[in-house]
């Protein structure tokens, strides 16, 4: 598992989460291809992930980066942390994320850390249970972040003031 990151001219932070070699067996032998999993974010709440496949590693990474830029979501952050603690799952991967006080840093492993870093989360406590397959962990993390709402948006939906729901 590689952790490659770079800044692009659009202001996005790009991280390579995983490159995997897969083999297709045919009559004449094996055909090797590569898959790449990447996450892209602006460090201010916009984040996306993508997967790319190709015969060459750089082409797979490029396809994954383009897919990640196309599939970006907006996350409502509470400053540099999450709004509230949450659980999420995808397949056999389960993730738990909770907000942390200023100065805590990102306490998360592997694929979750990459997603949270590019999203702009700087203080969080996170744990992955079950399968640690990076693809499923990234999916589960995204499900949790996508469902997170700010108290202001919840109050607006209910037609109440923020003080009434907190």
Swiss-Prot record:
Keyword rRNA-binding: yes
NCBIfam families from the UniProt entry: rpsE_bact (TIGR01021)
Protein name (Swiss-Prot/TrEMBL): Small ribosomal subunit protein uS5
The S5 DRBM domain, residue ranges: 12-75
UniProt-listed GO biological process terms: translation
Pfam families found in the cross-reference section: Ribosomal_S5, Ribosomal_S5_C
Role summary: With S4 and S12 plays an important role in translational accuracy. Located at the back of the 30S subunit body where it stabilizes the conformation of the head with respect to the body.
Protein family according to the UniProt entry: Belongs to the universal ribosomal protein uS5 family.
InterPro entries listed in its UniProt record: Ribosomal_Su5_D2-typ_SF, Ribosomal_uS5, Ribosomal_uS5_bac-type, Ribosomal_uS5_C, Ribosomal_uS5_N, Ribosomal_uS5_N_CS, Ribsml_uS5_D2-typ_fold_subgr
Claim: Zinc is one of the keywords in the record: no
Single GO MF descriptor: structural constituent of ribosome
């Amino acid at each position: 598992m590689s952790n490659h990151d770079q800044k692009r001219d659009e202001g996005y932070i790009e991280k390579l989460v995983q490159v995997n070699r897969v083999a297709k067996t045919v009559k004449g032998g094996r055909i090797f291809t590569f898959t790449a999993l990447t996450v892209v974010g602006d460090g201010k709440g916009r984040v996306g992930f993508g997967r790319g496949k190709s015969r060459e590693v750089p082409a797979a990474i490029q396809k994954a980066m383009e897919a990640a830029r196309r599939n970006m979501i907006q996350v409502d952050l509470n400053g540099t942390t999450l709004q509230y603690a949450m659980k999420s799952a995808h397949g056999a991967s389960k993730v738990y994320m909770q907000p942390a006080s200023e100065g805590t840093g990102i306490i998360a492993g592997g694929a979750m850390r990459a997603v949270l870093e590019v999203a702009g989360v700087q203080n969080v406590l996170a744990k992955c249970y079950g399968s640690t397959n990076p693809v499923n962990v990234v999916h589960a993390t995204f499900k949790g972040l996508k469902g997170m709402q700010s108290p202001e948006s919840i109050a607006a939906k209910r037609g109440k003031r923020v003080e009434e729901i907190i």
